[in-house]
Amino acid sequence: RGLGDVYKRQPFVYFYLPDTPKKLKRLEKTDYRTFGNNGNSIITSRELRWFLRDIEDRRDAVLSLYEEEKREPLSFPIKLSAGADMEEIAAAIRNLLELTEDIQCKFRKPEVALSHCIRVLEKWDVLIFQATKIAPSEMRGLSIAYERMPIIALNRKDEPYARLFTLCHELVHIVTRTSGICNDVNENSVSQNVIGMKCNQIAGKILVPLNELSSHPTIGKIRKYGFDDSYVYQVSRDFAVILISF
């Protein structure tokens, strides 16, 4: 039992098996990335390996419950090419998330916007998990693009505004079926991963569409009186994003 606690193997009956259990093969479409969004990096954290196994097990459990209740999981409603126009992808995701300028103005806080987006996605049978024991430097978000019950995981150690951006970033991976683990979703990332950087750009367009930003009343004040932190705060509050995003 002590070894079970140390090696995170529960139940400890694993230690009485006649041989090492076979590892389940991961989906080929799942790109497990960790450091710098580098697909060649090796996952070394025990916590992250355990988390990956746990969320897959939880998905299997939910699928079993659906089967017992004779329910069919919903198919994820959007599938677009990774080469599709960024505005098209962003608009499709905003529509899926039921985001409009009026709705975003009511959020006021990123955590409220995040709860709204999670609630909408769960209606489509998207499984949302939040890691609590993994450093953001190792994983800020991950996605596994199953056609039914896709998985998105966020890092609870991140601030709500960061998790909101990560959620949108991972949604792009789901929509384009380019899932993976991301440790850096900062828009100024020097990552060479083209898809990851594109996901960052689209995530920004999901949260702050250029046409809505341009027509925001405060933008007129900035053009007339110059850039000021108070104006930036007004815009960031209305779009429920962090001030530094601007």
Say what each PLM segment does.
Residues R1, D5-F246:
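Short juxta-domain linker segments that transition from a proline/glycine-rich
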